[in-house]
Regions:
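Active-site-proximal helix/loop segments of hydrolytic enzymes
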Residues: 2-188
């Protein structure tokens, strides 16, 4: 996951988003420590990239999670973000769709901002593991997560079909926006 997180952080930085990683390659903070870090940093969003394991080698697939409990309390922005990311990833990968689900896990519960956990397959499944070992697949996942985040901020301008919005498209939009921003501020 470290390599995938670095790929995503690089793409985020290239499109004007600051990415703070809660761990280094040689560390593994608890979910409570990650939540405390995000809260102290004043992050706008938290993305947790994760792979799963199961006793059954047949368990496979992709799922996204946001905060929500059985009493109807949910993070509406987290739910929307999880949905955008999930749709982008399922349309770009051949992974089994396990859906978007609400949970009360520590990281989702303790953060003060929308938080999404992305479960990108099972290391115990040969097909999922093979995909995760492929750098090109990790690029596809990083692009899908980035586009999902950008779609959250493009609501009302969401005119491109799911799975077709690329890193190059996002970068071009950001560059075009930067070029028009000075012209707008000069008119003020």
């Amino acid at each position: 996951m470290w390599d995938l997180a670095r790929r995503l952080a690089g793409r985020m930085a290239a499109t004007g988003l600051a990415a703070l990683l809660t761990r280094r390659e040689d560390t593994c903070p608890t979910e409570a420590e990650r939540a405390a870090f995000a809260n102290a940093a004043g992050a706008d969003l938290v993305l947790s990239l994760h792979v799963d394991a199961n006793r059954s080698m047949h368990a496979q697939g992709l799922a996204t999670f946001h905060f929500g409990n059985g009493s109807g309390i949910t993070s509406t922005v987290g739910e929307a973000l999880a949905g955008f990311i999930h749709r982008e990833l399922t349309s770009r990968t051949a992974m089994l769709d396990l859906g978007t689900q609400a949970r009360t896990w520590e990281l989702l519960r303790l953060t003060r901002m929308p938080t999404v956990r992305v479960e990108i397959g099972y290391l115990t499944n040969l097909g999922d593991r093979r995909r995760l070992l492929d750098p090109a697949f990790r690029d596809v996942v990083a692009e899908g997560v980035l586009v999902g985040v950008k779609r959250l901020y493009l609501q009302g301008q969401d005119d491109q079909p799911t799975g077709t919005f690329t890193f190059s498209d996002v970068l071009a939009r950001e560059l075009a926006r930067e070029e028009t921003a000075p012209a707008i501020s000069r008119r003020s």
